[in-house]
């Protein structure tokens, strides 16, 4: 007998829908009270999409004669949407644990960068690594993210800086997209740094004349799927003009603009992003008041990275100001050799403590708003009928434990589910 549905999550103490009216993002007063059902159940169909969410008794009656491939008793537990990590650099070779010691001794990000460390160190090792080596380490990192509750990950290239290695990184992301259970959003980040021996203008020319046309060709053939274009818009890296040229080139070929801006110096990157119709801008530690207003008006998402501010001892992004002005605030781990954090629950905790976000604001920023930053909030980021059945089940009677708890989340998370299939069970 064939099952009529894939999964029933029944009798949960709480089911956190996040949204209940098909919202693509949450801002302002909508963030104060997320949609939460007490004593509820969730049904996922064989197509991997959510078929019903509602009070347990109603669901039980509605689906009484039907069968399920799997039923999970969620009594005393909470069901939340799978978490969305809106900013990661997960494909690379070359550990940089030695740089952590330098930072603790007082070296800045730019000190290390200028001494040949930082991105340059990783670039050398990533260029030398085989595709298989990169895939194996990437797969392990995704596994760690998944065990901390992440089901949709933005993944950047950017440690090649030459066409050959950038494509190698994007092929690794593409292979993972096809073979693994997590949802991935691929970002071409060839303008992550200026390669040795080139000026920023020469690097931009190379990207526009060679990298982007090749990407377009590979996308057209179905060999690669790239979603976003990224540039590190920063003093001493890519200035506003070269950033504009590269982003416009990517936009012309249908890529969403999603870039690093206003991190170490005020660059007016937020104003540029709003003008170009960017989907998202990350970092924003040094964003201007005008930039915040422009992003709110343009519905351009701010991807804030509390791990980076914490590890580099930067000033915190002004999350409260952005939230109060109506900016769509999202969160990311910024996982990279410089910020070695896999865990979105940890990111949410830091966002609450260091950036003064509330727990509902942080959860929305790590679900529906992070999905919006990737242009995927119509399919991901909330537990609503018709959306992908990505969820986590935590062994706690209130959902806030996911953020309140500082570390040890693999003990709290009992199940991780994508498209209605259990991909991790404690």
Curated annotation (Swiss-Prot):
Cofactor(s) the record lists: Zn(2+); Fe(3+)
| E.C. code | 3.5.2.7
Sorted alphabetically, which keywords does the UniProt record give? Histidine metabolism, Hydrolase, Iron, Metal-binding, Zinc
One GO cellular component term noted in the UniProt record for this chain: cytoplasm
Q: A Gene Ontology molecular-function term?
A: imidazolonepropionase activity
Amino-acid positions noted as binding Zn(2+) in the UniProt annotation, renumbered to this chain: 260, 334
Instruction: List ligand-binding residues for 4-imidazolone-5-propanoate.
Output: 159, 192, 263
The record lists Fe(3+) as bound by: 260, 334
The chemistry this enzyme catalyses reads: 4-imidazolone-5-propanoate + H2O = N-formimidoyl-L-glutamate
The keyword Iron belongs to this UniProt entry's keyword annotation:
yes
Pfam families from the entry? Answer: Amidohydro_1
Question: Any idea which positions bind N-formimidoyl-L-glutamate?
Answer: 159, 336
Spell out the InterPro entries in the cross-references: Amidohydro-rel, HutI, Metal-dep_hydrolase_composite, Metal_Hydrolase
Q: How is the cofactor bound?
A: Binds 1 zinc or iron ion per subunit.
- A GO biological process held by the record: L-histidine catabolic process to glutamate and formate
Q: Which domain of life is it from?
A: Eukaryota
- Please name the top-level EC class of this enzyme: hydrolase
Name the pathway.
Amino-acid degradation; L-histidine degradation into L-glutamate; N-formimidoyl-L-glutamate from L-histidine: step 3/3
| Similarity section | Belongs to the metallo-dependent hydrolases superfamily. HutI family.
Q: What is this protein called?
A: Probable imidazolonepropionase
> Which gene specifies this protein's sequence?
Amdhd1
């Amino acid at each position: 007998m064939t099952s009529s549905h894939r999964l029933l999550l029944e009798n949960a103490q709480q089911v956190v829908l996040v949204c209940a009216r098909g919202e693509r993002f949450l801002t302002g007063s909508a963030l104060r009270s997320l949609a939460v059902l007490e004593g509820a159940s969730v049904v996922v169909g064989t197509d991997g999409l959510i078929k019903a969410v509602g009070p347990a008794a109603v669901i039980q009656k509605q689906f009484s004669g039907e069968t399920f491939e799997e039923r999970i008793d969620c009594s005393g537990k909470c069901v939340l949407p799978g978490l969305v990590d809106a900013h990661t650099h997960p494909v690379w070779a070359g550990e940089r644990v030695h740089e952590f010691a330098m930072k603790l001794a007082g070296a800045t990000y730019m000190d290390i960068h200028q001494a040949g460390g930082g991105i340059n160190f990783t670039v050398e090792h990533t260029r030398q690594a085989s595709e298989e080596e990169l895939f194996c380490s990437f797969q392990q990192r995704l596994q760690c993210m998944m065990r901390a509750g992440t089901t949709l990950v933005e993944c950047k290239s950017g440690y090649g800086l030459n066409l050959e290695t950038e494509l190698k990184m994007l092929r690794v992301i593409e292979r993972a997209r096809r073979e693994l259970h997590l949802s991935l959003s691929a970002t071409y980040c060839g303008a992550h740094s200026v390669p040795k021996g080139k000026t920023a203008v020469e690097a931009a020319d190379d990207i526009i004349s060679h990298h982007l046309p090749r990407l377009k060709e590979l996308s057209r053939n179905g060999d690669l799927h790239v979603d976003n274009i990224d540039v590190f818009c920063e003093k001493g890296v890519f200035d506003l003009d070269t950033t504009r040229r590269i982003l416009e080139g990517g936009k012309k070929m249908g890529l969403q603009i999603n870039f690093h801006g206003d991190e170490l110096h005020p660059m007016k990157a937020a104003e540029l992003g709003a003008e170009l119709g960017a989907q998202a801008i990350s970092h924003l530690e040094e964003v201007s008041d005008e930039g915040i207003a422009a992003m709110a008006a343009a519905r351009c998402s701010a991807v804030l990275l509390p791990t980076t501010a914490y590890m580099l001892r930067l000033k915190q992004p002004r999350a409260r100001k952005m939230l109060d002005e109506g900016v769509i605030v999202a969160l990311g781990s910024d996982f990279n050799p410089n910020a070695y954090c896999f865990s979105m629950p940890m990111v949410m905790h830091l966002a609450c403590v260091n950036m003064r976000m509330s727990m509902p604001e942080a959860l929305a920023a790590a679900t529906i708003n992070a999905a919006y930053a990737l242009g995927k909030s119509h399919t991901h980021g909330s537990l609503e009928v018709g959306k992908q059945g990505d969820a986590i089940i935590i062994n706690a009677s209130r959902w806030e434990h996911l953020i309140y708890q500082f570390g040890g989340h693999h003990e709290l998370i009992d199940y991780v589910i994508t498209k209605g299939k259990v991909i991790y069970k404690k």
